[in-house]
Structures are given as C-alpha cells and as structure tokens.
Amino acid sequence: MTRLVTLELLMAGIGSALLCFPDCILGEDTLFHEDQDKGTQLDSLTLASINTDFAFSLYKKLALRNPDKNVVFSPLSISAALAVVSLGAKGNSMEEILEGLKFNLTETPETEIHRGFGHLLQRLSQPRDEIQISTGNALFIEKRLQVLAEFQEKAKALYQAEAFTADFQQSREAKKLINDYVSKQTQGKIQGLITNLAKKTSMVLVNYIYFKGKWKVPFDPRDTFQSEFYSGKRRPVKVPMMKLEDLTTPYVRDEELNCTVVELKYTGNASALFILPDQGKMQQVEASLQPETLRRWKDSLRPSMIDELYLPKFSISADYNLEDVLPELGIKEVFSTQADLSGITGDKDLMVSQVVHKAVLDVAETGTEAAAATGVKFVPMSAKLDPLIIAFDRPFLMIISDTETAIAPFLAKIFNPK
C-alpha cells in the first residue's frame, strides 16, 4: 500500500508595519558564494525575479478561482516547503517541483537552488532590532516510518527543519501536536492549520513564516473613521479608514495599466507596495502581473507629496488546498502513484496527498504583523495644481517586499477588507 505524505504549508502576515525577508538581512549582493566545484552563482536579484514569477503565476490561478474574494498567501513559504520536498524527490518528480517554482535547471543546478534557499533562511533566522521575523520548517514523521538519515540531515542543514515523531494512527493527538506547534511558532496567529488527518498519513511537513513590523510613518488612530469601500457591483461596506496627510512617499501613476502605485515603508529594510487599479481595471492589472511589471513600477517610483492618503484598516485570512492548484503550474507527479520520493525513505512508496496553506494579514495604524518603463509615467507633483488625494476605497493589491532584494514574501488582493 502506498503511504501518503501530507504536506502542510503555513504563513501569517500583517500589513501596516512589517518587514520582509531576503536581503534585508543580506549585506552581500549574492545569496551564496561560488561553490568550490561549480562556478554557478544565484544572485539575489535573480532569486527575487524567480520568486516573483512564481508568486504572480500562483496568484493568477488563485484569483481566477476566487474572483470576488480576498487573496493572501506567502509565495516564499510555499516555495520553501516544496523545495524541502524536492530534496527527497528524484527524476521527473524533482524536475517538476523546481521548474514549477520557475527555476531553470539548465541554468541553475539543483544543488545551487538548495544552497540559495539555505543561505536565505539562515540569514532570516538572525535576530533583527526593528523587525520580528520567524521562519522555519518542521517534519512530523510517523513513528513507524523509516526516513533516510541523509534526507533529515539535509533538511535540517539547508532548511532548518526540526524533526518530530508522531503517531498518526491517533489522529486527534497527532493533529493537536501539529496545530499547537504551528500556533506557538506564529504567536497564536494561525490556529487549526490541520483540520483533517488521514490515518494513512506517514509524514507532515509544516512551513511557517511570522513577521511583525512598524510603519516608518504610522497612522494616527484618532484620524481613523468609518468610510465606504466599494467591492464591484455590490453595495458598499463600511470599514475603518485610516488617514495620512501631507505624506512624502514613493509614488507613480501607470497610465498604460490604469493604476496608481504607492509605496509605504516600514522601519528597517522592508516596504509595502499598494497597487490601486482604476475603477473596473483590476483584471487588466492582474493579467499584467509579472516580474518585469513589478520592476518597472519600482524603478519609476519617485518621492512625492500626497496631500491625503486613505487606507482601510483590515485583517484578512485565507486557506488553500494547493494540491488542486499546483498541477496547473506543472507540479503533478508527486500527487500521483508515479511519484518518486525515494530520497526520503529509500523506496518509491510515498506520495504527497495534501498541501495546505493558511495566511493571515493584518494592517493597522501602527504596523503589520504576519504569521505572508514603457507605459509607466511619473507625474511630478510640481506640475500639479490640484491636491493629490489617493483613496484605497475599492479593491487593491498589496505586495510586501524586501527593499534590497525586491523579493516578495507576501502577496494579497484586498477585495473586501471587512
């Protein structure tokens, strides 16, 4: 009988003051140095572009399935967890995972990918003064399952994966063990990650990310008021609306994509990019999401005086069963009886049965807490006679990024902040 590996992914985030992971911690412009045997290097900008490509590809799949719902997830959390699985995958199973994560295996060898992730996660685990970040992996292994020592050692060395034994025949106790661990690691933000646990389960892989930061320019709670938010054709909903006046912050108006882009910075090396499509233009902006678009926006941002900025205060969450979505990105074999995960047990007796991802994003006055060129025209404020007022009173996108590497650990669409 084929045993099942249940892969659980977790992510939590808040968006008012926050930090991002990758290079905010890196003082170098590469994620890892040249290997003694190979001359291949994966620089941070390339890794950021690859991560962004995966993020936008997955986002489009999730948004298409839920066009009138909030979307929030951590592409970094998901890719790191799948990369751990790829450590034990062989042949086509391994290639599908890494290529599904948008890596080009002819340009970047598998060993360099793992080394890059390992270096990144190691840097992220270092304590920060201005931002709280916690990220890691945990393996919950059926006590009767024999896992190769080499796999456990690599998972621990590269991905800081802790290993625990569990009795999945006692599903209630095993579920509590895992959920309690996740709750503790995410400061209580993620509760009940696993709701169902099959008795055939042999292993559960949990990835978590938690971060908390503060806005560089915080909102004054005394200025927050009830205002209307317009979600499509529905009647507007009342939401707490935060307000900033006379704010100097990076801004650009994209005339080609019909959207406004504003960057709000956190204390530390992180920022949140808010993309506000014009009325009825959300699908146009979503269809154009790709690494080049994000790069163009960031290159075009200029410090500008915004007379009034309105942003809803919100807390949103989402749960995803990604085993139904990842095959659309080319990751198929690991979910079938053709899966080759022999690098985990030494036998081809494992397959992935479930990939669960849960994200929480809170945006408030003080900050964010988490447990996730052509056509771009900058309009100089000196040329504007009318005051610049930007109101996020309709669906918008939010991308949390590291300001040094441009990696986006969290991506969200706020369709209804209430």
Curated annotation (Swiss-Prot):
Tissue specificity annotation: Liver.
Subcellular location: Secreted
Domain of life: Eukaryota
Induction per the UniProt record: By acute inflammation.
Cleaved signal peptide residues: 1-29
Keywords: Glycoprotein, Phosphoprotein, Protease inhibitor, Secreted, Serine protease inhibitor, Signal
Predominant subcellular localization, coarse grouping: secreted
GO biological process terms, semicolon-separated: cellular response to cAMP; cellular response to glucocorticoid stimulus; cellular response to interleukin-1; cellular response to interleukin-6; cellular response to type II interferon; response to bacterium; response to cytokine; response to lipopolysaccharide
Stretches for region RCL: 367-394
Pfam families in UniProt: Serpin
Post-translational changes noted in the entry: N-glycosylated.
Other remarks in the entry: The single human alpha1-antichymotrypsin gene (SERPINA3) is represented by a cluster of 6 individual rat paralogs.
PANTHER family noted in UniProt: ALPHA-1-ANTICHYMOTRYPSIN, SERINE PROTEASE INHIBITOR, SERPIN
UniProt comment concerning the protein's domains: The reactive center loop (RCL) extends out from the body of the protein and directs binding to the target protease. The protease cleaves the serpin at the reactive site within the RCL, establishing a covalent linkage between the serpin reactive site and the protease. The resulting inactive serpin-protease complex is highly stable. Variability within the reactive center loop (RCL) sequences of Serpina3 paralogs may determine target protease specificity.
Similarity-based family: Belongs to the serpin family.
Protein name, entry field: Serine protease inhibitor A3N
Gene name in the database record: Serpina3n
